[in-house]
Regions:
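Multi-pass alpha-helical transporter architecture, strongest
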Residues: 133-139, 257-266, 347-378
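Juxtamembrane intracellular "pre-TM" segments in multi-pass secondary transporters
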Residues: 141-178, 203
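Helix-breaking motifs and short loop linkers at transmembrane-helix boundaries and internal kinks
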Residues: 14, 35-41, 52, 69, ...
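Extracytoplasmic gate region of multi-pass secondary transporters
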Residues: 169-230, 284-288, 292, 319-327
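Structural signature of the two symmetry-related core transmembrane helices
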Residues: 17-31, 245-261
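Helix-loop-helix hairpin linking two adjacent transmembrane segments in secondary transporters
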Residues: 80-140
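Cytoplasmic helix-loop-helix junction between adjacent transmembrane helices
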Residues: 44-85
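Conserved MFS/SLC helix-loop-helix module at the cytosolic interface between two early adjacent transmembrane helices
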Residues: 1-39
Length: 378
């Protein structure tokens, strides 16, 4: 929720300094988490970590929007979001290696007795402070303009003003609204995917640490391939067809949907099963560049960070919450009714997420008209 306020703030102030503040803030409270003595002392720092994290993506996307041409924004936004598949991969690899008693001794020592969970928080916090302060070395050209012009538009922009402009954009641009809606439906699938590793262990017979390691390796390469493919091809699609990038996601989702269904029911020794696993991480990498670039292109420049913050609020608060909570409830309700409750729950939420397909199609068809209307209005 704080992201909406931080997004509006990013449209008014020096963005490099704001990113530095946000990263340093959450890094300090990450270190504070390592000193926690109980639930309250762990929960309170997490709240401030969320405030700091809410600054990064809206502000970064706004910076990218000002420094990359529109026809290359799909790749730029996708490359920024490369952190998602890589972060998932690293976490799975760490979980797999730490849980596996056959892991290399140096890994067990480093992540276990030598540092411990508190030490991990301290280490990440110190690293974050260093990275945050390094942002002060980058200059925000727009920030310089704000300082030198006392009557700039950014100075005049208030939070309520930004919300009015955003609401007007949502009313007047079906492409914007449907791109956001498609993102929400996709994140319902991602929310349900919190049970993916449990499904692989409980209903497909994998060892927990082994499948975590395998998934981590797949996530690295498939995620990277997805980021490059999604960014470059969606930019090419827009340039050659003048159809919005969501049309690219429409075709991608439509083509990959049958494989996503089939691999839920085949044996893990078959090729189609592993193709399905790879495609899941590949599609994740493809998603972010086209959608984040599109939502920025369909609003006035002065609220780019605000619309990104609103988009993140929607996909997290609605998409991930509905997906994770709904799938968990469905698993509990179907245990004892179905032999494989995780399989059916993931499949059902996969079909719910498939509602992204018509959303992206209509958004892509409307894109050129809505973009032209925006440029005329400006």
């Amino acid at each position: 929720i704080m992201g909406l306020f931080m997004g509006a703030l990013a449209d008014k102030v020096n963005r490099s300094k704001l990113i530095a503040f946000g990263v340093v803030l959450w890094s300090i409270f990450t270190m504070a988490s390592g000193a926690a003595k109980g639930f309250i002392t762990l929960a309170l720092p997490r709240m401030f970590i969320g405030v700091g994290e809410s600054i990064l993506t809206p502000t970064s996307m706004s910076l990218l929007g000002d420094n990359f041409p529109s026809k290359r924004m799909g790749f730029a936004a996708g490359f920024y979001y490369l952190g998602v598949p890589l972060g998932v991969a690293v976490s799975l690899l760490l979980v797999g290696f730490v849980a596996d008693i056959k892991s290399p001794i140096f890994l067990q020592g480093l992540l276990g007795e030598t540092i411990g969970w508190r030490g991990c928080f301290y280490m990440l916090g110190v690293l974050g402070v260093i990275l945050g302060l390094s942002m002060l070395l980058f200059k925000d050209k727009r920030g310089t303009e704000i300082v030198t012009s006392s009557i700039s538009e950014e100075e005049k922009l208030t939070f309520s003003g930004a919300m009015k402009i955003l609401a007007n954009a949502l009313r007047n641009s079906p492409a914007l609204t449907l791109t956001i809606s498609g993102g929400v439906f996709y994140h319902i699938v991602l929310g349900a995917a919190a049970f993916e590793q449990i499904w692989l262990v409980e209903e497909r017979g994998f060892d927990r640490s082994v499948i975590a390691q395998i998934s981590g390796v797949i996530a690295v390469f498939a995620g990277l391939a997805g980021v490059l493919f999604g960014g470059l091809v969606s930019d090419w699609w827009l340039e050659k067809t003048n159809q919005g990038r969501p049309i690219f996601l429409f075709w991608l989702s439509l083509i990959l949907l049958p494989i996503g269904v089939m691999y839920r029911f085949v044996e893990p020794t078959t090729i189609i099963f592993w193709v399905g696993v790879v495609i899941g991480y590949f599609q994740l990498g493809c998603f972010y560049g086209p959608t984040f670039s599109t939502v920025q292109e369909l609003v006035p420049e002065k609220i780019r960070a605000t619309v990104v913050a609103f988009y993140i609020l929607c996909i997290n608060l609605i998409g991930l919450t509905v997906g994770s909570l709904g799938a968990g409830i469905l698993v509990d309700l179907t245990k004892g009714v179905f032999e494989e409750p995780y399989t059916w729950s993931l499949l059902i939420f996969g079909f719910i997420g498939a509602l992204e397909i018509p959303c992206f199609y209509i958004a892509g068809v409307r894109y050129a008209k809505d973009k032209a209307n925006l440029e005329t209005a400006v």
